[in-house]
Amino acid sequence: MRFLGLGLAEPVPDATTVWLFRQQLKQQGLIEELFEQFDRDLRDQRYQPKGGQIVDAAVIPVPKQHNTKEEKQKLAQGEIPESWQQKPHPLSHKDTDAHWTKKNDQSCFGYKNHISIDVEYGFIRPYQVTDASVHDSQVLGALLDQQNQGEEVWADSAYGSESIEWIIHILQFLSHIHEGVNRNHPLTAQQEEDNRERSQVRAKVEQVFGHWVNEMGGK
């Protein structure tokens, strides 16, 4: 309420109103411009990104689509069903960009928010939004903040691969990616200790996602 300049006695916009307003901003191509302005304002207030950065991703579910088998096949191919194109009103109520993914052995339909926060202040700096089927590691290169005054990067084991380590090295960052557990190759005592230390830092990004889960139904 304080952010919007609303008083205690004034009505608060409901979720639908906020969503419709955001859609208007999106259609006019203003989302990125507003976020960049917000980031500039943070820097002007001396909230420079520092201390390194933490990257992570969270699934944001949307209502499931009730589509026919033929419609699902078209959507899977990246096409809009012909019947929708002929009926603009139904099309406006269909989400043609969201996709399915698996999270903790449960199927989720929606999008995925990929973010990088600075360790010092915990503000979201670069971010990317994809459909839920995109793997966390696929957008790492776009998330790394070159303006962060720290060189260290923290991430969970979903980002653990030789190609990701190569990207981090090429961009001159220092990797603190969580060691993944392998059934045939258990972690050493040192690796477990390193993971505990990494988790203490990564807890900051979990707080950001915790808010999304509690307030917006993320996963």
What is each residue range found by the language model?
Residues 1:
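DNA-recognition alpha helix
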Residues 72, 152, 157-219:
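Helix-centered, glycine/charged polyanion-binding patches within enzymatic domains
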Residues 4-171:
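Polybasic low-complexity intrinsically disordered regions
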